[in-house]
């Protein structure tokens, strides 16, 4: 790696640490020529392939901006959105793919958003899945109710098992 100060083509790694979220490695380097230290951050690349076929780097900011409109007027904080974007990125990276279709990013948003806020989920899903009628909304609401019933049944069963 070139030294940013003297452009010497070599450097020595002095220290390496994994970032807090585990998505990157921070390295302290020292140039053997000028002996100055600098920091580099290494991440794996994740490319989103848009409908047009053009690829662009994955952006948590784009995920947050896309979900923010669905969350307007809801009790969802900026921190909640940041956590959601991180969860979406982690889920996508866990698939092991270096490239992912934009459509798949939208699908990866739906699960964490549903856990965060059901109304925001319905708003996002209505646009993302192109709801065309009231029946589409009713169907999505029925699925949410069914899942809530299943979750409630599981919680009841846990409470009954405990002495």
Curated annotation (Swiss-Prot):
User: What family is it from?
Assistant: Belongs to the NrdR family.
Q: Name one GO biological process term.
A: negative regulation of DNA-templated transcription
PROSITE patterns the UniProt entry points to: ATP_CONE (PS51161)
Keyword Transcription regulation listed? The answer is yes
What's the short name of a Pfam family annotated to this entry?
Zn_ribbon_NrdR
Q: Which residues form the ATP-cone domain?
A: 46-136
Keyword annotations for this protein? ATP-binding, DNA-binding, Metal-binding, Nucleotide-binding, Repressor, Transcription, Transcription regulation, Zinc, Zinc-finger
How is the cofactor bound, as the UniProt entry phrases it?
Binds 1 zinc ion.
State the organism of origin: Renibacterium salmoninarum (strain ATCC 33209 / DSM 20767 / JCM 11484 / NBRC 15589 / NCIMB 2235)
This one is known as Transcriptional repressor NrdR
The gene coding this protein: nrdR
The record ties this protein, via HAMAP family, to: NrdR (MF_00440)
According to its UniProt entry, the function of this protein is described as: Negatively regulates transcription of bacterial ribonucleotide reductase nrd genes and operons by binding to NrdR-boxes.
């Amino acid at each position: 790696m070139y030294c940013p100060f003297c452009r010497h083509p070599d450097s020595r790694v002095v220290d390496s640490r994994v970032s807090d979220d585990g998505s990157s490695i921070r390295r302290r380097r020292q140039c053997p020529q000028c002996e100055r230290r600098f920091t580099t951050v290494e991440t794996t690349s994740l490319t989103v392939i848009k409908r047009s076929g053009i690829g662009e780097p994955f952006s948590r900011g784009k995920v947050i901006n896309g979900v923010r409109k669905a969350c307007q007027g809801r009790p969802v904080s900026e921190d909640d959105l940041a956590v959601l974007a991180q969860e979406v990125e982690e889920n996508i990276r866990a698939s092991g793919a270096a490239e992912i279709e934009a459509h798949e990013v939208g699908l990866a948003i739906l699960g964490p958003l549903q856990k965060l806020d059901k109304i925001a989920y319905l708003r996002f899903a209505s646009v993302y899945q192109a709801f065309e009628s009231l029946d589409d909304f009713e169907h999505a609401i029925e699925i949410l109710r069914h899942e809530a019933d299943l979750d409630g049944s599981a919680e009841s069963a846990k409470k009954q098992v405990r002495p």
